[in-house]
Amino acid sequence: MQEQSGGQQLFGQISDDTALLSLLQGSESDHGNALTDFISWCDDNFLDLNVSKTKELIIDFRRNRNTAKECIIHKESMEIVTSYKYLGTIFDDHLKFDINTEAIVKRGQQRIHLLRKLNSFSVSPVILCSFYQSFIESLLSFSFICWFHSLTVKDRNSLNSIVNICSKITGVKQRDLNYFCNRQIIKKAAGILASSGHVLKSEFSVLPSGRRYALPACRTNRHSKSFIPSAIRLLNAP
């Protein structure tokens, strides 16, 4: 992670996937010098930017949204999209993750067919459960600590229906996604607290009692269901 001047821009790079995150305030409508500097750095280091695959996703919850300024890379306009898949998760411009859930459910149903085929060979429940955990549960739980609590009841039921179907096929009750997600959130939060240099550690502030963490003030339901508030509520639970 690399923070730009003023703390308003942040570069995140995982392997060859690079994301520029900009916090625009007031009348700001572009990435400032951060994008220009990044393009120049790529040119200086003989790296080609594929403009056709470079997208811009604008997340703005204000009632009066500013008109986005068109970004130009080497005289080519960057396409503005309403959803984008980054590191295996589909983000939309309202952070509802319903599109991501639909994609997961579709792929999960395809893998249920494979589980049924495997069951038709009369293999042991141990092998069926191993297949489920490796190919289906891993799909349902990928990055879900970031988005599961933000889902609507309908989307949660769609995911849980896959778990219920797989439980019937394997003959073994598979773990509930809500319980599994809460356990993973606590595990992730513990990892953040144990790391002195983690960027999110400052979000966990201990109350004067020394036994509980201060819950951030959440003005929206969306913020309340995000990772940090959810993690603090679980850590404070008796």
Explain the meaning of each model-derived region.
Residues F11-I14, E28-L35, L49, T101, ...:
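Hydrophobic packing residues in well-ordered alpha-helices of helical domains and bundles
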Residues T18-D43:
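Catalytic palm subdomain of template-directed nucleic-acid polymerases
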Residues S27, T36, S40, D48-T82:
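Short, conserved micro-motifs composed of acidic
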Residues K154-P238:
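Short linear motifs embedded in intrinsically disordered, charge-biased segments
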Residues K75-I145:
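Basic, alpha-helical interaction scaffolds
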Residues M1-S22, L139:
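Active-site palm subdomain of RNA-directed nucleic acid polymerases
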Residues M1-G7, K96, I127, Q133, ...:
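Conserved pre-motif C helix in the palm subdomain of viral-like polymerases
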Residues C42, E56, I136, C166, ...:
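Hydrophobic, well-ordered secondary-structure elements that form the walls
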